[in-house]
Structure formats: structure tokens, C-alpha cells
């Protein structure tokens, strides 16, 4: 089982320095701009909630160094063991409803699941909805419209990675087909 996605690498949320503080501020603006495209009237406040939520998730994820250690990412658990960690969801019932029939799962981020009930509960449901909406539009931005694709490139391509210009549409199309 995987964990929740972050919009940037874990260290941006956890290492407090000038570079990461600037990146988080730009990321929050980016999240707000994407939520505005979804019609949010309170996009700035929702974006702050999304970024704060991702910070709370990042606290429980492996560091880059730890994630290279396969023994830390290989955590076999029975459904009963996982259910003891994750109490806010009736896991056996959920797995049955989605058609998964298994007695064991392998968890890559055990810290996330140990803190799942703190991260996913009725009290933070509104921010979780904003988080999910943002990640849906962010994931498909390059395919939804030129404006969304350009906005995504401006943040991830230019700001985070220093690319001067976006690759040509035909090259990007081949990358999608090739899965690269």
C-alpha cells in the first residue's frame, strides 16, 4: 500500500531553510491558482490548508535516505494488523467493496499508516477534499487545458527545476505514449 501524495518532495516540507521556505510559498500560490481554476472563491485559504495538510503528512514519511533502504519499505502486514493501525476506516469492508481479496498487504510507508487516524478523520474532511481536488487537477493539468499546463510548467518546470522552456507538444505527446 502506498501513502498520500505530496506536491513536492518531502524535504521541502521538513527542512526549514530559505530555499524551502520560498518553494513552499510559491507552491501555495500555485495550489491557489489551480483551485481558482476549479472555481474556488476562497482559493488562498484552501491552498494554505492543502499545504499545511501536506506538511502534516510529510512528518510521517521516510527521508530520501531512508527510502533507499528496502528493508524500511517492506512492511508485510495482515489485514488484521493493519486494521489495528487504521481505525477510522473499516478496512476489511473497504477492501471487499473495491474487489480486493487478500489477507496480507505490504506497506511502503509504515509511519504514514501509524498516524493515519490523525491524518484522515472527520475533523479535517474539508481540507482533505481540497487536497484531493487539487491533486486531481494537478495530475491532469497538462491534458486539461493549455492554461493549466502552462501554469503547472511555470511552477514545476521553471521554478523548481530551472527549465527555460517547455518541451514541444509533439515531444511531450511521445513521452506520454512511451511512458517517460
Please name every model-derived segment.
Residues 1-180:
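Noncatalytic, helix-rich "gating/capping" subdomain that lines the substrate-entry/channel surface
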